[in-house]
């Protein structure tokens, strides 16, 4: 499976088998991005045990990441956190874009994650696998999405927010398992891990700031 050449002159045939649009010297146009996402919609997931992240489980041989941050207290903070997740605010990082930005949080929705690096851009695709909507002593909302053939890695990631009624605390929680897609991803895997750690840090900060900002608007 060959990556798209970084010459911005690619032909439609290069999308035929869902080959990753991984490395680009310039930011791709909106039309090109949406065309690539569209080409992935009918393709299968690129890994096994689809949906395993819902139960905090991962297939053997995958790297597991989990991070969590407190967003606030009370039902108002939880409502703001749910709204933030529905709006993909965890991807509002400056160097990362979720496309299309108004993608619905529903099973089957296919999205692209465009990231700007030092001197190049990358685009990866994923599809929502499941939704989480739980009530009780701990209210929880979230979703998991999994990688498609147009992704440099294989795996699944779950984003969720929860309100513990007894403790009256609201948290943002992420669980993911991943591995590089051979043979292209292995040489760049250390760099990919650095990006994953950067995303974890920035994603937590984005959610904290968004929930706090909405609170200020309401006071």
What are these model-predicted stretches?
Residues 3-5, 11-118:
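Hydrophobic ligand-binding cavity/cleft-lining segments
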Residues 11, 118-166:
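Hydrophobic-ligand binding "helix-grip"
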Residues 65-67, 111-113, 126, 143, ...:
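Hydrophobic residues positioned within well-ordered beta-strands of beta-sheet architectures
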Residues 107-108, 139-145, 170-174:
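A short hydrophobic beta-strand element
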Residues 147-194:
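Beta-strand/loop substructures that line and gate deep hydrophobic ligand-binding cavities in soluble
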